Regions:
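Surface-exposed acidic/polar loop and edge beta-strand patches at domain peripheries
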Residues: 28-228, 234-243, 247-401
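Short, conserved catalytic or interaction motifs in soluble domains
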Residues: 24
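C-terminal motif of bacterial Sec signal peptides marking the signal peptidase cleavage site
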Residues: 18-21
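Bacterial N-terminal signal peptides that target proteins for export
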Residues: 1-9
Length: 401
């Protein structure tokens, strides 16, 4: 046998050994305990591809910066998660959300997802054409309520009620919670990525007075995340519109008591109770009360239960700045309400949870309720061809010590 033939035989034997070695069982120490299969993240939720905007960090971990934003076009462009680098902590979840696999199981259109309700239980759902609650006359079957705007009847899903016996069903948080988005496009920018899309809402499933297009832009950069919605009346009748957002902001340390909240609102709307959370029409000055979070550095959340609406908002450089600070994590996030139409801020922060939902919105709760005695409650009137834009920006900061 030639030297060349011997070489080829040895090479073949080595190849066979190598392949067999790749298939051999792991050592007993590795296989003694069966390992659970890792959950496979879904590629779609709501019948549309999940969009993840990403960017590479540029500060070597020395300053706070946003890293990613996950958006669900199949669920009304819900901003499901945002991640950021925090010096000393590394990458953290900015929003309180389950895994994508768990979210897909919850966002299933079942009994707990009526009208898309599960969308506003985590992440950041957009609330159009009305944030908050709307009361009205309940239908005989208990499925809808009717209310009036400028003498015209509006029928809405009665998709929510409190937990107490006899709680009144009402409409809650808009009509796009489970909507699909058209023309979804992503673009790489100088310092991140942007996603855009349009919800051709029409008359919102027969519930609204005209036809509406909603144009979304979610922009990720290192120093900010911007969310913008423009609503345009593309129908033939005038219509009311309000826009809001329902992001659940994490408290990274998990220590809710020491977390601080700053809300530049001089009054809150009194509610009947924290189960219905229906406004009474009375606006109460916050000065001297536990609801006074106007100090520049805010005050600790401590054990205060919040599901309250602030108004008479003071602006800084034209924006309504609400701050959530976690001193234990050396972390702060600023929610800047840029649109002049933003009239109120709702904050939902139960003392047993490690988040604060900060909702910058156009309107008061139950905006057409008789309790307001004709007051301007923030609903914007769009005539055919008119539009209005809601714009909120998130900015990270390091709190002063």
């Amino acid at each position: 046998m030639s030297v060349r033939s011997q070489y080829l035989l040895l090479l073949a034997a080595a190849t066979v050994f190598s392949i067999a070695g790749c298939k051999q069982a792991p050592p007993p120490s590795e296989s003694a305990t069966p390992q659970p299969a890792a959950a496979i993240a879904p590629q779609q939720i709501g019948g549309q591809d999940i969009v993840k905007l990403e960017r590479k960090p540029t500060s070597d971990g020395q300053k706070p910066e946003f890293l990613s934003a996950t958006v669900l076009p199949g669920r009304g462009m819900n901003v499901f998660q945002i991640t950021a680098n925090i010096p000393g902590k590394g990458e953290v979840d900015v929003l309180a959300s389950p895994s994508l696999a768990d979210a897909a199981a919850k966002l299933n259109g079942g009994p707990d997802d009526q009208n898309g309700n599960a969308s506003f239980s985590f992440g950041g759902a957009f609330l159009v054409p009305y944030p908050n609650r709307i009361r009205g006359k309940l239908s005989a079957d208990g499925k809808t309520i009717t209310t009036e705007w400028e003498g015209k009847t509006i029928t809405l899903p009665a998709n929510w009620k409190g937990k107490n016996p006899g709680a009144e069903p009402h409409a809650m948080h808009g009509l796009i919670l489970a909507s699909k988005t058209d023309d979804v496009k992503t673009e790489t920018t100088a310092d991140g990525q942007t996603v855009t899309g349009t919800i051709h809402a029409g008359d919102f499933g027969g519930h609204w007075l005209s036809n509406t297009d909603l144009n979304f832009t979610i922009a990720l950069a290192g120093d900010a995340v911007d969310a913008t919605i423009t609503a345009k009346n593309v129908g033939n009748e005038a219509e009311p519109i309000a826009i809001g957002w329902h992001p659940y902001f994490n408290i990274p340390s998990g220590d809710r008591k020491q977390a601080r909240l700053h809300v530049p609102g001089e009054q809150t709307a009194q509610v009947n109770n924290y189960d219905d959370v229906f406004p009474t029409g009375k606006l109460i000055p916050v000065k001297g009360t536990k609801y006074d979070f106007t100090a520049p550095d805010g005050k600790p959340l401590d054990d205060i239960f919040l599901d309250d609406n602030w108004s008479k908002l003071q602006r800084t450089d034209g924006a309504v700045d609400v701050d959530l600070t976690d001193p234990a994590s050396n972390y702060g996030i600023k929610v800047e309400g840029i649109s002049p139409e933003i009239k109120t801020v709702q904050v939902y922060a139960p003392p047993t949870k490690e988040f604060a939902a900060i909702e910058e919105q156009f309107n008061f709760g139950d905006p057409w309720g008789k309790e307001w005695h004709g007051m301007d409650t923030g609903m914007v009137t769009l005539k055919p061809g008119q539009s209005v834009t809601w714009h909120v920006r998130l900015v990270l900061f390091t709190p002063l010590k």
